[in-house]
Amino acid sequence: VSRLEGATVLVTGGAGTIGSTLVDALLEAGVGRIDVLDNLVRGRLDNLAGAQASGRVELVRGDVGDRDLVHDLTKGKDLVFHQAAIRITQCAEEPRLALEVMVDGTFNILEAAAGHKVDKLVAASSASVYGMAEEFPTGERHHHANNDTFYGAAKSFNEGMARSFHAMTGLDYVMLRYFNVYGPRMDVHGLYTEVLVRWMERILDGRPPLIFGDGLQTMDFVYTADAARANVLAAASDTTDGIYNIASGTETSLLEMAEALLRVMGSDLAVEHGPARQVNGVVRRLADTSAAARDLGFKAEVELEEGLRELVTWWKPLRDEIAATRKVDAK
């Protein structure tokens, strides 16, 4: 943890789900000062309220696409955590914006981190790089040929850029392939997170959660605080030029998720099934998490029901506010 003690840090996307939870974890780990770069398109000021009260956190409202700003903020930093991205659905709707944010933005971060000789860069990748995997549990060496999303392609290229910067400049980096992150502060407009929110609304209203189809598609859920902790461990470790799955290593079907949520919310309703909709191409996710355990000392600690309980507690007072943002989703 000596690398963290008193460190000056930049967190991009630091007002978002994982970013803000990471800021909290970094303060706890004893870093000296944190600059957060966030354009607040997905990030929320509330997510940083606790951290900003520490007096050690400064929010800079801006974009990773702003090369000069990124360089200014990276100068003099010991550590950089790159979490900024746009969501997978928006990448499909606006691929040029996705290119500018996900690819050019990440290039700016890599260029600045290498140029200003930061000790280490920890950056977010995604299980999306695998597309519909062929091997389960899925290890990091699984190929990327099955991915057909722009988001996944951008994350693959980000990984490739990071490796090449390591080869060209000696940049120390670790990248983390997040699987299905859920929990307090989560982006409520994501593909599966939106489903969770609708279920919570229905259950609270005394109506059964609705699943389109059999609900047997699976995900590998990892709690927000666990994903944040993985970043802290990656920064503290001596590992470099490494890419790791960050997941629970447990497969959960949509049906099991709905049933767990019913239990957590104290409801005895049964899940209701509707007609199957067009299927998302990825019907199964299960990560091999042994590499992260071996090299980073990371293992997910928060069990699904415990995590869902925390999610419900966070969501309840924000219910109306969250529902109101659904129709006018920020483009």
Segments the model singles out, each with a brief description of its role:
Residues 157, 161, 165, 195, ...:
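Hydrophobic alpha-helix immediately C-terminal to the catalytic Tyr-X-X-X-Lys motif of short-chain
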Residues 1-181, 302, 310, 314-321, ...:
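N-terminal Rossmann-like NAD(P)+-binding domain of SDR-like oxidoreductases, especially those catalyzing
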Residues 183-185, 279:
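Short beta-strand->alpha-helix junction loop in the catalytic core
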Residues 108, 186-187, 217-219:
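Heptad-repeat alpha-helical coiled-coil signaling segments
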Residues 18, 195, 253:
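Conserved alpha-helical elements of sugar-nucleotide-dependent glycosyltransferases
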Residues 29, 201-331:
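C-terminal substrate-binding subdomain of Rossmann-fold SDR/epimerase-dehydratase oxidoreductases
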